UniProtKB/Swiss-Prot annotation:
Biased composition (Basic residues): 367-376
GO molecular function ontology, one term from the record: GTP binding
Name assigned to this protein: Translation initiation factor IF-2
Ligand binding (GTP): 495-502, 545-549, 599-602
UniProt-annotated stretches for the region G2: 520-524
Gly residues: compositionally biased ranges: 273-363
Region (G4) location: 599-602
Cellular localization per UniProt: Cytoplasm
């Protein structure tokens, strides 16, 4: 049965792409899945016809070379002797067809006419080769079946005549001489080559064949062989003389033959053909040395294995080949490699003989042997890990400036890369980061170093400066000298807690501020301006009071940055304290002059000289000791030395500082403090540094913006404008700015709104990057385990932003064990509202609301009771810190330690069928208590542990405990391996206090 053609073979044959063939088959209504699917022969025929019709080529008639116009019939069974090789050639005369209307095939040698036919005149290739193939195939099938019987007898007669001619006549000049059969190494030319398929070229004569093949065999797999019930002609090597090459008709020229039929165009069943002398079908090459005869379809040749359809050259002697290359002398199969020289009756392989096949595949029978351990080990050693290339660009040390909290998308925009490639690079580094996620500074620096870029994290000051530059605002622009006017000095009072800073300001202002502070300590910055007569002039001095508690470090640093002169207050009785040194360092960092006020000199234990000596160690040398620092002895309560202190401040300002600022232009300054007032909304205490601030100006302070509705001084009086060094209370902001945020006035509301929005976005990104832990592959399991930790969740609300900031920093600086964690889910300024309670109740864990100097309304308290939310109020910061620290320690899991109770020696062992062995003991130390844990010791070694004193009796009475020196009887809870002389040690587990 003929093989089916595949779609890609048809596409190659038709000269088009496979998808074109698939589309055409779909139009024809045929379902074909892919280019490797097979197509039935009728479908392939219709496909070729469809392509021929589309090309507009007319169906060709039978060409002259295929069907001559005047055929001369010949008697089918009368053999005719062959003419001499040098004689003239006659045209081939085809066999008259049995059925009319079927075109006869190309030039075919007639069975009874052994003479060499004259080559037909070469014709040009028809316009459509496929129609010719189909017609030729059908004609050959009909003609072969019709001449079957005549061909058998004609072949016998032709072989007999050839043998006689070989013995009688020598070979003609130029023809091949008969000789021995060529060996496997002698490779004849391929069929169709110029040497083998040239028109009129005589075929080489065969040599003597060894024994023949069996005369009759089944049809086998050859669709063109002898069908069932028919007789196969004898093999070419069955004995007798070989035919002379001169008497053999030459094969037709390939130029005069139609193209070879494709497998798809062949009929499924075709009649067999005789393997007679030189009777190869059109398309086969000349006979091979060592034997003549054409092979069957896709088969090896007869004697000597003639090549089949696209077959390799045949080998030595043997039988004729069958379907896809038979065992005939190594005949080549369908597209096979050259066959080896088979022994008589043997054959080569269809898929290549003993030699190497196509594409370097080894010949011979394919084996499926297992690989050796050495081969497998070598392959395993040669394996390499796959590498993933992200395609991210590599830098050469270029500087990339990124803001805090920047994402990988921002980084990609700077280096013109795809954000996805940076995500893959981070994954290769072991960190899981999305393209839009805010990254920490360490993550950005790590990625930059990996890619070869020098990443610079822009500081908040530079970032804000770049933001303002987009709106043509320059805070550091130089001011012409003619615009500068003198301004009052800004003095910050700093020192340790309870050293009298606020009381000193009260004495200067002649007011009592301490009475209004909770706990007598300052909770936030206060700014005041006082007028002092000096040299007959009314001089203004702006004072800023900072907290002295250790939690307010940020406030003290902020106060030192906005000041001109620092008054360092040191109590004469306490001397230098930790916050004194911290305030001194802040002042030195700000590079501002320092005036030391030695306070509380009215106390009996005061020692001002000791203070001077201590401060000398920190670089502050008094003028009386040869230094340049002014020391003033004051007493705040009686008001001693206040005038001397103010005079020292003014002298320092005049001598060391040139205090000038422009009064015209937009106002600029800093927000010292801010809070949320219940009736007035967001209120900020600002200090004007440049320009003049007026009511109605549009200002932006940090992430808050708005229009100035009113300005109040330190006494609560409204002011129309505020110049340089003037602290005022500003109303009208949309939100509460942060303490220390710079403020500036702009021309319109649109500008300040855009500046505020961009500041808020950048701060959120930076805060998110800092609060979010680095999700690495190594710490993934640790983060999952963190969900099992006990956590204390807080909502912080305070009266001013500085106090909330200080409380938050103090809580995060607590020494918290790893078993618990502190989470602040929200912080804000103002009273406790319903939204705070709703946020706390919506959390999956318990949340406590901390109110610092703020309270909750009755409605809010009722809602908190209903939702089960705890609210705690504090007015002093260190009380809040202590209680929260105690609460964190209370969340720790208890730890237990073993405490020994006593020991008892076993004196006697009593057997009991009910309770087991009963130990009669005497208590040697401590006491023995019922249900206590026990262990059994024998010769100093532990025999049994984790035992329990089951029953305890003193004689016949039950006892709860037995003390040292008394006898008792006890059981060990079912444990019976007790011997005389053993020691029973009892203990209990007590909870250990966690630090």
């Amino acid at each position: 049965m003929a093989g089916k053609a595949r779609v890609h073979e048809l596409a190659k044959e038709l000269g088009v792409e496979s998808k074109t063939v698939l589309a055409k088959l779909k139009e024809m209504g045929e379902f074909v899945k892919s280019a490797s699917s097979t197509v039935e022969a009728p479908v392939a025929r219709r496909l070729r016809n469809a392509f021929v019709n589309n090309a507009g080529s007319p169906a060709p008639a039978a060409p002259p070379a295929v069907a001559p116009p005047t055929p001369t019939p010949t008697p089918p069974r009368t053999p005719t002797p062959a003419p001499p090789p040098g004689g003239p050639r006659v045209s081939a005369k085809p066999m008259p067809p049995r059925r009319q209307g079927v075109p006869t095939p190309g030039p075919k040698p007639k069975g009874p006419v052994p003479g060499p036919p004259q080559s037909a005149t070469p014709v040009t290739k028809p316009a459509s080769a496929h129609d010719i193939e189909v017609a030729a195939a059908e004609a050959r099938a009909a003609a072969l079946k019709a001449e079957q019987e005549a061909a058998v007898k004609a072949a016998q007669a032709a072989r007999q005549q050839q043998r006689e001619n070989v013995r009688r006549e020598p070979p003609t000049e130029g023809g091949p001489r008969p000789g021995p059969r060529p060996g496997p190494g002698t490779m004849p030319p391929r069929p169709g080559s110029p040497a083998a398929g040239r028109s009129g070229a005589p075929a080489p004569g065969p040599g003597p064949r060894p024994g023949g093949r069996p005369p009759a065999r089944g049809a086998g797999n050859n669709p063109f062989g002898i069908q069932g019930g028919q007789q196969r002609p004898p093999a070419a090597g069955a004995g007798g003389p070989r035919p002379s090459p001169a008497s053999m008709p030459p094969r037709p020229s390939p130029a005069s033959m139609p193209p070879r039929p494709s497998p798809a165009s062949m009929p499924s069943q075709r009649p067999g053909r005789p393997g007679g002398p030189g009777s190869g079908r059109p398309g086969s090459g000349a006979g091979r040395p060592g034997g003549g005869g054409g092979g069957g379809y896709r088969g090896g040749g007869g004697g000597g294995g003639g090549g089949g359809y696209r077959g390799g050259p045949g080998g030595g002697g043997g039988g004729g080949g069958g379907f896809r290359g038979g065992p005939g002398g190594g005949g080549g199969g369908f597209r096979s490699g050259p066959g080896g020289g088979g022994r008589p009756g043997g054959g080569g392989r269809g898929r290549g003989g003993g030699a190497a096949g196509a594409f370097g595949r080894p010949g011979g029978r394919p084996t499926r042997g297992r690989k050796s351990k050495k081969q497998r080990r070598q392959e395993f050693d040669n394996l390499s890990a796959p590498t993933m290339s992200s395609g991210a660009p590599r830098g050469q040390g270029q500087v990339v400036r990124l803001s805090r909290g920047a994402s990988l998308s921002d980084f990609a925009d700077k280096i013109n890369a795809n954000p996805g490639s940076l995500v893959q690079e981070m994954f290769n580094l072991g960190e899981m980061v999305t393209a839009t996620q805010s990254c920490s500074d360490d993550t950005l620096l790590l990625l930059g170093e990996h890619l070869g870029f020098a990443v610079q994290i822009v500081s908040p000051e530079d970032e804000d400066r770049e933001l303002l530059a987009q709106f043509n605002i320059d805070l550091d622009a130089e001011v012409a000298e003619d615009r500068l006017v003198s301004r009052p000095p800004v003095v910050t009072v700093m020192g340790h807690v309870d050293h009298g800073k606020t009381k000193l300001l009260d004495a200067i202002r002649k007011a009592n501020v301490v009475a209004g502070e909770a706990g007598g300590i300052t909770q936030h910055i206060g700014a005041y301006q006082v007028h002092v007569p000096h040299d007959g002039e009314d001089r203004a001095i702006t004072f800023i009071d900072t907290p002295g508690h250790e939690a307010f470090t940020a406030m003290r640093a902020r106060g030192a940055q906005v000041t001109d002169i620092v008054i360092l207050v040191v109590a004469a009785d306490d001397g230098v304290m930790p916050q004194t040194i911290e305030a001194l360092n802040h002042a030195k960092a700000a590079e501002v002059p320092i005036v030391v006020a030695v306070n509380k000199i009215d106390k009996p234990e005061a020692n001002p000289d000791k203070v001077r000596q201590q401060l000398t160690e920190y670089g502050l040398v008094a003028e009386e000791y040869g230094g340049d620092t002014m020391f003033v002895n004051v007493a705040a309560k009686p008001g001693t030395g206040i005038e001397s202190l103010l005079e020292a401040v003014l002298l320092t300002a005049d001598a060391s500082l040139e205090l000038t600022a422009p009064t015209d232009g937009p106002a600029q300054g800093v927000a010292i403090e801010a809070h949320l007032d219940k009736g007035r909304g967001a209120v900020a205490t600002v200090l004007v540094q440049k320009g003049t601030l007026r009511a109605g100006d549009s200002i932006v302070a940090g992430g808050a913006h708005g229009r100035v509705r009113a300005m109040l001084d330190e006494n609560g009086n409204q002011v129309a404008e505020a110049g340089p060094s003037r602290p005022v209370l500003v109303l009208g902001l949309t939100a509460v700015p942060g303490a220390g945020d710079t403020f500036l006035a702009a021309e319109d509301d649109r500008t300040v709104r855009q500046i505020a929005e961009q500041r808020q976005a950048r701060r959120r990104a930076a805060a998110f990057a800092n609060s979010r832990g680095r999700a690495t592959l190594e710490t993934l399991m640790e983060q999952l385990k963190a969900g099992e930790k006990t956590s204390l969740n807080l909502v912080l609300k305070g009266d001013v932003s500085g106090s909330v900031e200080a409380l938050e920093d103090a809580l995060f600086n607590l020494d918290i064990p790893e078993e618990v964690q502190l989470r602040i889910i929200h912080r804000g300024v103002g009273s406790i509202t319903e939204s705070d309670v709703m946020l706390a109740s919506a959390s999956s864990e318990a949340v406590t609301i901390i109110g610092f100097n703020v309270r909750a309304a009755n409605k809010v308290r009722e809602m908190a009771d209903r939702e089960g939310v705890e609210i705690r109020y504090y007015t002093v910061i260190y009380q809040a810190i202590e209680e929260i620290e105690a609460a964190l320690k209370g969340l720790l899991k208890p730890e237990y330690e073993e405490v020994e109770l006593g020991t008892a020696e076993v004196r006697e062992v009593f057997r009991s069928s009910k309770v087991g062995n009963i130990s009669g003991c005497i208590v040697r130390s401590g006491l023995i208590r019922r249900n206590a844990k026990a262990r059994l010791l024998r010769d100093g070694a532990v025999v049994a542990d984790n035992l329990t004193i089951g029953s305890l009796k003193r004689f016949k009475d039950d006892a709860t405990e037995v003390r040292e020196g008394f006898e008792c009887g006890l059981t060990l809870g079912g444990y019976n391996n007790v011997q005389v002389g053993d020691v029973i040690e009892t203990f209990e587990m007590r909870e250990k206090a966690r630090a």
